[in-house]
Amino acid sequence: DKDDLRKIVDDPKLNPEQKSQQIRNHPAIVRAEKEMAELTPTVDLPNFGSKEFVETRQFNVAGKTLQGYEQGIEELYKGGRKLAYEEMGLAVPINVLNRSVKNQGEKIAIINIGPPAAGKSAIANPLAVKHNATIVDPDEAKKALPEFAGGIGGNAVHGESKILSEAVKDLAIKRGDNLVLPKVGGEVDKIRTQIKELQGNGYKVNLVLTDIDPDLAFVRMNERFLKKGRLINTDAADAYRGKPEITYNKLKEEGIADGYGKIDTTTGIGEPKQVYEDTAGIFQDTAIRLRQNRNYGGAIRKDAGYPEYRIESGPKDGLIEILVD
């Protein structure tokens, strides 16, 4: 069944919409979703939240077996400090884990929203490196829990991973870190509340939308399942469909965040990305390769008070590649 699913995902003759239609109700997906549904959510365990549970909870972070929430949260925090460098294949600077080195400048938080498998990490990682920021990602907390079981237990640990990531975020705020927060962004009220909370803690908050065709995101989600064993229930993915963009547009209309950025993640990691909007120089001075059409229409503000992107020459009406070192 998985081999057949892989053929669909890899078929160059099918567009994302056609692949999406064939993937839905595929036997391999139906079977995996059934297995997921049979697992008990960890937040429903009889002793969840008890003193004993908190003190004896098992974690595995970066190959280290840990016991207790205190150790687990501290190790997840350290992982969030290093994550961007490790995923980008960069050496981790010494000061990244040096707690005596405090953030002396303006505190920045970037909330990066987009559907599952939208390629948020391709944007979040360079932004985290730019700002020496801690990435707080519930998906990283999921991996640390034994019930995750390589991915099939993603739903079972979903609730607990959110609790853990909130604790990691609170720790990072307490330590004055800059933050990058990848989220789906399916609920406007939750993102609005998050922005206000961060601003109340002295952060300048930028909201970033990773924009992608919903069918392509769905295909990538199932491709990730084949490669890594991680699966998001189809019904849940459908429930998120189109919601991050609604959230972005609504909050931009309200003007609640301090800056807004919208970037297309249709292309793969390392390939040039199309910027549709950047009101605060969010994507400037990062390792993200950007591209821009000359008939772009001014989506990047020219009066934003920061240097314009360095543009390399290109054909008159074609794409102009913007390289940001």
Where are the model-predicted features located?
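N-terminal pre-Walker A segment at the start of P-loop NTPase domains
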Residues: 62-99
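Phosphate-binding P-loop
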Residues: 100-106, 172-173
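Hydrophobic positions on the alpha1 helix immediately C-terminal to the Walker A/P-loop
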Residues: 123
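Conserved nucleotide-sensing/catalytic segment adjacent to the nucleotide-binding pocket
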Residues: 133-135, 140-196
